[in-house]
């Protein structure tokens, strides 16, 4: 049995991992799904993903786990990699979903800061229509209106101040490739085949940095593969979790 923290995407809810949490628990693993976009997680700290990494470690410690595996999607993946910088010796396994190890380009960072400024001015109402095409794959948008509607609801429910903070933190994040290169516990990379934000080349680069770990490609899914194809992602995560030794590292 592994203790596992599931770290959600931006700007969504921990509920995005409901099916994966059920599948992992059914396989005998203990699962905690921290909320990363709350005042409790952020406090009054300056924007820095290390703050969220500290929060995850504290949540897991409170749950009785000094060592644990971590699976993060998109922003959750960035936080997972920040956790490696903070306390890699406490991480028994790593799953990176629809994320990237590279830092933002100057253009991408500028876009994040402009997004944050607009949310600070206008709130979240404009965000779903402006971002849903990037977040969800073409197949999901065309055939799964219930998924589109659920993602819209999660976005609109997000705390705008936390969203601003998180975008600023992600814009400033460092490259994490070197952190992956020294991590040699059970790892997997998962990517939606229709993900345009963190596409397959980014996934392959992370897998190579991790020493050639498996890459699970999820068909007909975009950036939010865990929501778009929950059963396929659940199977990939259970297969990974089953490789983690109890009590490791």
Name each region found by the language model.
Residues 15-71, 82-87, 235:
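Active-site loop/oxyanion-hole signature of alpha/beta-hydrolase fold enzymes
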Residues 9-12, 74:
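Active-site glycine-rich loops that stabilize anionic/oxyanionic intermediates
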Residues 183, 189-191, 195:
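Short beta-strand/loop motif that positions the catalytic acidic residue
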Residues 104-110, 122-182:
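Conserved alpha/beta-hydrolase catalytic His-Asp/Glu region
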Residues 196-202:
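Conserved alpha/beta-hydrolase "acid-adjacent" motif
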Residues 221-234:
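Catalytic histidine-centered segment of alpha/beta-hydrolase-like enzymes
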Residues 81, 85-86, 90-129, 134:
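Flexible "cap/lid" loop of the alpha/beta hydrolase fold
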Residues 204-223:
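Catalytic histidine neighborhood in serine/cysteine hydrolases
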């Amino acid at each position: 049995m592994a203790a596992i923290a599931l770290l959600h995407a931006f700007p969504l809810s921990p509920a995005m991992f409901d099916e994966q949490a059920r599948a992992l628990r059914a396989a005998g693993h203990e699962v905690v799904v921290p909320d990363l976009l709350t005042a409790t997680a952020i406090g009054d700290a300056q924007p820095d993903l290390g703050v969220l990494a500290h929060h995850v470690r504290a949540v897991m410690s409170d749950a009785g786990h000094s060592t644990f595996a971590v699976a993060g999607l998109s922003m959750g993946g960035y936080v997972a990699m920040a956790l490696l910088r903070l306390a890699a010796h406490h991480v028994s396994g790593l799953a990176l979903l629809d994320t990237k190890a590279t830092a933002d380009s100057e253009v991408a960072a500028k876009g994040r800061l402009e997004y944050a400024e607009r949310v600070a001015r206008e709130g979240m109402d404009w965000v779903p229509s402006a971002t849903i095409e990037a977040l969800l794959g073409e197949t999901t948008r065309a055939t799964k209106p219930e998924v589109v509607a659920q993602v819209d609801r999660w976005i609109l429910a997000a705390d705008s101040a936390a969203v601003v903070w998180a975008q600023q933190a992600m814009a400033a994040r460092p490259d994490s490739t070197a952190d992956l290169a020294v991590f040699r516990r059970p790892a997997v990379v998962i990517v939606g085949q229709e993900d345009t934000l963190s596409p397959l080349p980014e996934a392959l680069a992370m897998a190579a940095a991790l020493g050639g770990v498996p890459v699970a490609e999820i068909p007909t899914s975009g950036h939010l593969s865990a929501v778009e194809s929950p059963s396929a992602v659940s199977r990939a995560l259970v297969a990974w979790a089953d490789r983690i030794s109890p009590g490791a590292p």
